[in-house]
Structures are given as C-alpha cells and as structure tokens.
A protein has these predicted regions:
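N-terminal helix-turn-helix DNA-binding core of bacterial DNA-binding proteins
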Residues: 21, 35-83, 88, 163-167
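Hydrophobic structural patches
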Residues: 30, 59-62, 151
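A short local structural element in Rossmann-fold oxidoreductases
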Residues: 42, 122, 159
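N-terminal leader segment of winged-helix/HTH proteins
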Residues: 1-49
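Charged, amphipathic alpha-helical coiled-coil/dimerization segments
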Residues: 4-9, 76, 89-152, 156
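A short alpha/beta connector and helix-capping loop motif
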Residues: 155-163
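Active-site phosphate/pyrophosphate-handling residues
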Residues: 25, 57, 82, 134, ...
C-alpha cells in the first residue's frame, strides 16, 4: 500500500496570500448566522412541533400564499426543486399539505396547507416570533428597522453575485 500523502504535504505558511477577516466579511457573517439559526430552529421545531426548519419555511410561505406551485416555493426560499419536492412529499404524507394537479395544466400543482397543517403553522409561528424577538433584543427599535432595510436591500441586490454572467 502506498504511503499516505497526508504526512508528506506541508501546510502553506500563514503569511502567504490574502485571508478573510471573518469579523468583517459580510457573506461569511450572513452564512454563519443563517446556519446557526437554521440548525437551532430545526432542533427546537422538530422537538416541539415535529417539523424541521425547511418544512416550517414552506409551511409559512403556504400560509401567506396558499395554492402556489412548487416553482414559487423554490423561488421565494431559494431552494432547488429536488429538496422542495422531497419536503413537500413528506408534508403531504403526514397530512400537513395538499398537493392538487392543476386541471388546466397537468404539469403544475397547487399546494396548500391542510387544516392540520394550518394548525401546526399557527403553533410554530408563535415560537418563531419569540425566537425573532429574542434574537433582535440587543437592538433598539430604530436599529431593527435599519437592519430590516439593509437586509432587504442586500436581498434585492443578490443578482449582482448570483447572475449567471457573473464570474
């Protein structure tokens, strides 16, 4: 068996090339916050309500926009079709959503919360608002408004880095 290449590879010196300042690099901050919020939400929502954070995101969108197709869910929450489709199948199997084929276009489906799904949503949303309140408790009301405005502007500017023509 050939010797492991791990022992022969030397790490690059720390002072070679640029590095990120993780205290100032905005994409890292956003990613770290999102990951930690998502992981803790999944653990909490799963334990308390039997839904994970992806299921909750979809259910919350369906409460706002009942009867939408999966493509709309993908667009709004920024997930690929595969994970959304699998999540919807699980929600349907558990009786939380209803998926109906559009009679005018058999390729399109209308997705809505069932009564059971709406009841679950109505329990989870109370906890979601409480988590948001606790997260933002370190900010004044004015700072919260500024944060929301800045996040909205960043969201609207995502095309600057997600556009397929961007290198």
């Amino acid at each position: 068996m050939p010797p492991s290449t791990r022992s022969r590879q030397r790490p690059a010196p720390a002072d070679v090339g640029p590095t990120l300042d993780l205290d100032r690099y905005v994409p890292a901050f956003i990613t770290f916050i999102a990951n930690k919020l998502s992981n803790s939400a999944t653990a909490f929502y799963q334990k308390q309500f039997g839904v994970n954070v992806t299921e909750w995101r979809i259910m919350s969108l369906l409460a706002i926009e009942p009867g939408i197709p999966a493509s709309r869910i993908c667009h709004v929450i920024g997930f690929d079709k595969g994970p959304v489709s699998r999540t919807l199948a699980g929600l349907e199997k558990r009786g939380l959503v209803s998926i109906r084929t559009d009679p005018d276009d058999g390729r399109t489906h209308s997705i809505s919360l069932t009564a059971r799904g709406r009841a679950t949503h109505d329990k989870v949303i109370v906890a979601a608002f409480e988590r948001e309140k606790r997260l933002l408790s370190c900010l004044s009301k004015d700072e919260r408004e500024v944060l929301i405005d800045l996040l909205r502007r960043l969201h609207e500017n995502l095309g600057a880095v997600t556009d397929s023509s961007y290198g």
